[in-house]
Amino acid sequence: MNNIIHNDAPTPWGIYFQDGASPVYDGIVELHDQVLFYLLIVLVGVSWILFSTILRFRGSGIVHKYHNHSTTIEFVWTVSPALLLIAIAFPSFKLLYLMDEVIDPSITIKAIGHQWYWSYEYSDYTDKEGQSIEFDSYMLPTEDLEEGQLRQLEVDNRVLVPVNTPLRFIITATDVLHDFAVPSLGIKVDASPGRLNQVSTYVQREGVYYGQCSELCGVLHSSMPIVIEAVSLEKFLSWLDNQ
C-alpha cells in the first residue's frame, strides 16, 4: 500500500502551489500551467528575435530598407497577441464562473472576521441547548504548540467539515476588511463589514487545510490563521452529536 503525503500547508522556500483538495483548486492550477506555457513561448520567441537582430546588425551600420515598415509584420504582431489573449480569456472566464456558482449546498458555514480572530457558525445545526453551533477560533501561542503543529498556523478550534459534500461559506467581518483564504481548497474571499460574500467548495479528501487572513487588517494581521479539518461524514455527524 502506497502512502501519499500531501502538502496542505505553506512550506519554507516553497515556489509552487500546495496540493489541491477541491475541483476549483485543480482548475486554478491547470489554468496557471497553461498560461505559464504560453508565456514561455512568448518569452523564447521575443528573446530569439531580439538577440538575433542585435547580433546580426551590431556595429555594421547596415539598415534594411524593409525594416522601416512592413504590413505583414504589423499584422502578425497585432493578431498573435489577440489570439493569445483569447486563448487565455475563455478558460479563465469559465473558471471564474464556476468559482462564483453555488449549487444546492448541503452545509452552510458562516465565517466572521474580527481583530484578530475568526468566529464560525453552523446555522443549519443546533447544539443541545437549541442554539446554533458557533465558536471562536484563535491562533495558538507558540508555547502551547504540541509536537508537529505549525507555528502561527494552528488554532484552538478547527472548522470541521465532511468530505465529498457540497459546502458553502458565507463570509463577513465586524470591524475592518479581512480576507478568508485557504489555498489548498482554492478559497480566497474578502470579509467586509456590512457585506455578505459567499463561496462554495467541495473537499475531495480527508485532511487538515491551513489558511490565513490575506488582507492587511492591523498589527496582529499575521495572527489570524484558518484551519479546516475534513473528515468522513460519520465523524462529522458524531461531532455534531457532541455539541
From Swiss-Prot:
<comment type="similarity">
    <text>Belongs to the cytochrome c oxidase subunit 2 family.</text>
</comment>
<feature type="binding site">
    <location>
        <position position="217"/>
    </location>
    <ligand>
        <name>Cu cation A1</name>
    </ligand>
</feature>
<dbReference type="InterPro" id="IPR001505">
    <property type="entry name" value="Copper_CuA"/>
</dbReference>
<dbReference type="InterPro" id="IPR002429">
    <property type="entry name" value="CcO_II-like_C"/>
</dbReference>
<feature type="binding site">
    <location>
        <position position="224"/>
    </location>
    <ligand>
        <name>Cu cation A1</name>
    </ligand>
</feature>
<keyword id="KW-0679">Respiratory chain</keyword>
<feature type="binding site">
    <location>
        <position position="215"/>
    </location>
    <ligand>
        <name>Mg(2+)</name>
    </ligand>
</feature>
<feature type="binding site">
    <location>
        <position position="217"/>
    </location>
    <ligand>
        <name>Cu cation A2</name>
    </ligand>
</feature>
<dbReference type="GO" id="GO:0005507">
    <property type="term" value="F:copper ion binding"/>
</dbReference>
<feature type="binding site">
    <location>
        <position position="213"/>
    </location>
    <ligand>
        <name>Cu cation A2</name>
    </ligand>
</feature>
<dbReference type="InterPro" id="IPR014222">
    <property type="entry name" value="Cyt_c_oxidase_su2"/>
</dbReference>
<keyword id="KW-1133">Transmembrane helix</keyword>
<keyword id="KW-0479">Metal-binding</keyword>
<keyword id="KW-0813">Transport</keyword>
<keyword id="KW-0496">Mitochondrion</keyword>
<comment type="subunit">
    <text>Component of the cytochrome c oxidase (complex IV, CIV), a multisubunit enzyme composed of a catalytic core of 3 subunits and several supernumerary subunits. The complex exists as a monomer or a dimer and forms supercomplexes (SCs) in the inner mitochondrial membrane with ubiquinol-cytochrome c oxidoreductase (cytochrome b-c1 complex, complex III, CIII).</text>
</comment>
<dbReference type="Pfam" id="PF02790">
    <property type="entry name" value="COX2_TM"/>
</dbReference>
<keyword id="KW-0472">Membrane</keyword>
<dbReference type="InterPro" id="IPR045187">
    <property type="entry name" value="CcO_II"/>
</dbReference>
<dbReference type="GO" id="GO:0005743">
    <property type="term" value="C:mitochondrial inner membrane"/>
</dbReference>
<keyword id="KW-0460">Magnesium</keyword>
<keyword id="KW-1278">Translocase</keyword>
<dbReference type="InterPro" id="IPR008972">
    <property type="entry name" value="Cupredoxin"/>
</dbReference>
<feature type="topological domain" description="Mitochondrial intermembrane">
    <location>
        <begin position="98"/>
        <end position="243"/>
    </location>
</feature>
<protein>
    <recommendedName>
        <fullName>Cytochrome c oxidase subunit 2</fullName>
        <ecNumber>7.1.1.9</ecNumber>
    </recommendedName>
</protein>
<feature type="binding site">
    <location>
        <position position="178"/>
    </location>
    <ligand>
        <name>Cu cation A1</name>
    </ligand>
</feature>
<keyword id="KW-0249">Electron transport</keyword>
<feature type="transmembrane region" description="Helical">
    <location>
        <begin position="35"/>
        <end position="55"/>
    </location>
</feature>
<comment type="function">
    <text>Component of the cytochrome c oxidase, the last enzyme in the mitochondrial electron transport chain which drives oxidative phosphorylation. The respiratory chain contains 3 multisubunit complexes succinate dehydrogenase (complex II, CII), ubiquinol-cytochrome c oxidoreductase (cytochrome b-c1 complex, complex III, CIII) and cytochrome c oxidase (complex IV, CIV), that cooperate to transfer electrons derived from NADH and succinate to molecular oxygen, creating an electrochemical gradient over the inner membrane that drives transmembrane transport and the ATP synthase.</text>
</comment>
<keyword id="KW-0999">Mitochondrion inner membrane</keyword>
<keyword id="KW-0812">Transmembrane</keyword>
<dbReference type="InterPro" id="IPR034210">
    <property type="entry name" value="CcO_II_C"/>
</dbReference>
<dbReference type="GO" id="GO:0042773">
    <property type="term" value="P:ATP synthesis coupled electron transport"/>
</dbReference>
<feature type="topological domain" description="Mitochondrial intermembrane">
    <location>
        <begin position="1"/>
        <end position="34"/>
    </location>
</feature>
<dbReference type="InterPro" id="IPR036257">
    <property type="entry name" value="Cyt_c_oxidase_su2_TM_sf"/>
</dbReference>
<feature type="transmembrane region" description="Helical">
    <location>
        <begin position="75"/>
        <end position="97"/>
    </location>
</feature>
<feature type="binding site">
    <location>
        <position position="215"/>
    </location>
    <ligand>
        <name>Cu cation A2</name>
    </ligand>
</feature>
<dbReference type="Pfam" id="PF00116">
    <property type="entry name" value="COX2"/>
</dbReference>
<feature type="binding site">
    <location>
        <position position="221"/>
    </location>
    <ligand>
        <name>Cu cation A2</name>
    </ligand>
</feature>
<dbReference type="GO" id="GO:0004129">
    <property type="term" value="F:cytochrome-c oxidase activity"/>
</dbReference>
<feature type="binding site">
    <location>
        <position position="213"/>
    </location>
    <ligand>
        <name>Cu cation A1</name>
    </ligand>
</feature>
<keyword id="KW-0186">Copper</keyword>
